[in-house]
């Protein structure tokens, strides 16, 4: 599923996005953010992060630099290392 989503995003970036004027208010662009989020966090969480990001893309949000959050270590979530 992850590879299919990545292919769809790449298709969008290469063939669909160039047909419209660039007007993304964020860096990286929403499609690049989605690609990075899926690669970093997997299909489910990456898609969730992408949806959250796209919902922020409106005229009342200032935009700017908004990187994909780094993946947390499993041990940093309160789990003991044995």
From Swiss-Prot:
Places the protein is found: Cell inner membrane
One GO location term (cellular component): plasma membrane
Upper classification of the organism: Bacteria, Fusobacteriati, Fusobacteriota, Fusobacteriia, Fusobacteriales
Function: Could be involved in insertion of integral membrane proteins into the membrane.
Family designation: Belongs to the UPF0161 family.
Name listed for the protein in its UniProt record: Putative membrane protein insertion efficiency factor
Main location: membrane
Region (Disordered): 61-82
UniProt keyword list: Cell inner membrane, Cell membrane, Membrane
Xref: HAMAP family: UPF0161_YidD
Record membrane topology: Peripheral membrane protein
């Amino acid at each position: 599923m992850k590879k299919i989503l990545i292919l769809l995003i790449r298709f969008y970036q290469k063939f669909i996005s160039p047909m419209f004027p660039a007007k993304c208010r964020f860096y990286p662009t929403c499609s690049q953010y989605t690609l990075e989020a899926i690669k970093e966090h997997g299909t489910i969480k990456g898609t969730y992060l992408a949806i959250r990001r796209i919902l922020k893309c409106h005229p009342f949000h200032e935009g700017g630099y908004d990187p994909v959050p780094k993946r947390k270590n499993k041990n940093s979530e309160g789990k003991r290392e044995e």
